[in-house]
From Swiss-Prot:
Family, similarity comment: Belongs to the HflD family.
Membrane topology category: Peripheral membrane protein
Name the record gives this protein: High frequency lysogenization protein HflD homolog
InterPro entries documented for this protein: HflD (IPR007451), HflD-like_sf (IPR035932)
Organism listed in the record: Pseudomonas syringae pv. tomato (strain ATCC BAA-871 / DC3000)
Subcellular location(s) per record: Cytoplasm; Cell inner membrane
């Protein structure tokens, strides 16, 4: 796997999270498989490669790849505006989080607690979702930059949906951190679009 492929997979995780947040906000729905993949990505501590974080299958990130491709292509007809906004916000929040050792310590201590809940209840259980959402609220929500989620207020006001959105945002920011760790930089999204798209299309259509 090339460095660019590793970066695209991690960035695909960011965009996958963004797409799912947008879907919950607008429809109140998300598949258990998609939710489980995102929550599971928070708990993988020793992956053999970047794809292993997302269950080892590109299909798990297909919607994220598609949203990323539309952003890189800059085609107004296919651009998914809200997911793009959420993805860029997550990249920005990750930069703020990286400077806060106190928040990273809280996350580091509470992820194993969530892992033990997963072993007891299963990964998509409402207790796990609530605990993961609360972790986002206690850490990322305290930063100056906030992600404003747009959608149907009836969906956004349901506590379970709000917890799912926060939990998925936490997973997306974990993906943003992974993207940085494998060499990703925001300037690539501006200056290396064609190169990224060339490597992304095989992942998208594979």
């Amino acid at each position: 796997m090339t460095p660019i492929q590793e970066q695209l997979i991690a960035l695909g995780g960011v965009f996958q999270a963004a797409v799912l947040v947008d879907r919950i906000a607008k429809t109140g729905q998300v598949s258990e498989a998609a939710l489980s993949c995102m929550l599971g990505s928070l708990l993988v501590v020793d992956p053999k490669d970047t794809l292993d974080v997302y269950g080892g299958d590109d299909l798990n990130l297909h919607e994220g790849y598609r949203a990323m491709a539309s952003a890189l292509e800059r085609d107004p007809a296919t651009l998914q505006r809200e997911p793009l906004r959420y993805a860029l916000s997550m990249l920005g929040l990750e930069r703020q989080l990286a400077k806060r050792d106190d928040l990273l310590e809280i996350i580091g201590k509470r992820i194993p607690v969530i892992q033990s809940q997963v072993e007891h209840f299963g990964i998509a259980h409402e207790n796990v979702i609530a605990a993961t959402g609360a972790l986002y609220e206690d850490t990322l929500s305290t930063l100056r930059q906030r992600i404003q989620v747009q959608g149907d207020m009836r969906n956004l006001q349901q506590p379970n949906n709000a917890s799912k959105i926060r939990a998925i945002l936490l997973a997306g920011i974990r993906s943003a951190r992974l993207w940085r760790q494998v060499g990703g930089h925001r300037w690539q999204l501006v200056f290396s679009r064609r190169k990224l798209l060339k490597e992304l299309y095989p992942l998208l259509h594979g």
